[in-house]
Amino acid sequence: MRQFSACIEWLFARDGDAFADRIRLAHQAGLDAVEFWHWTNKDLDAIAAAVAETDIAVSGMVAEPMIALTNPANKEAWLKGLRESIAVAQRLGARVLIAQAGDDLPEFSRAEQRAALVAALSAGADVLKGSGVRLGLEPLNTKIDHVGYYLSSTEEGLDIVDEVGRAEIGIVYDVYHSAVMGEKTEDVIGGRIDRVVHVHVADHPGRGDPGTGHIDLADRLNWLFAQGYDGRVGLEYRPRTDGAEAVRAVVKSLGG
């Protein structure tokens, strides 16, 4: 059976005043995993307690600090933060950390920024080795949500991962961002499914609940799983209707 992870930055936010309570709400909705973005602004003790209480998994979080890896001057600060992020991931049982490339910086050429990104990820792979945690580089759309971001192409993201050439480094494939950029899943992922460490879904337009837009998310997930993807699917959407019943309906519609 497919496994789904609730991004509790958005899901259950209306009913869970305390962030850790959103973990309990996700568990009550029948989900077996949650994910979130930054960890440095969270009460990790409260999160750990909720995880232990519910026996729910934390599927992933952001590798902090979220600074531009396209700037070579940021590499050492990012590696220091990566070590700290790995320790937090291990404490919470998370298997995936998410990295963003950073902005497309005008003071550097595209080639220079790519080289900086590859260098940071290569060094990061050494830090990750043996930790049980993988890092997913996430392409984001630059048409709506992340204007000025360096990495909007899934294929380029995969090419960067292949240039690094380490099992510790893969990509996060966000179906919403990919669709906004006009990509077809089979065209950009075909033959390289093993590089995908995590998947995100939301519908378009609006980045809302699956089924409210024009992306056939069930079809795209069917294709990904048929190719051999065996990880969790992160529900990273802005819910029109929050709560357990709405989330259960979404999971069912996506093959859960």
Protein language model features and the residues they cover:
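Histidine-acidic metal/acid-base catalytic patches
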Residues: 1-30, 93-95, 119, 151-173, ...
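Active-site-proximal loop/turn and secondary-structure-junction residues that shape catalytic pockets
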Residues: 10-12, 38-40, 63-67, 102-105, ...
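Generic structural signal for hydrophobic
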Residues: 26, 51, 85, 89, ...
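Short, conserved active-site loops that position catalytic residues or coordinate cofactors/metal ions
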Residues: 29, 56, 60-66, 100-102
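Conserved beta-strand positions in the central sheet of alpha/beta enzyme cores
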Residues: 35, 60, 98, 136, ...
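Glycine-rich, proline-tolerant flexible connector loops at the mouths of alpha/beta enzymes
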Residues: 35-53, 101, 108-109, 144-145, ...
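Active-site acidic/histidine proton-transfer and metal-coordination neighborhood
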Residues: 53, 72-170, 180
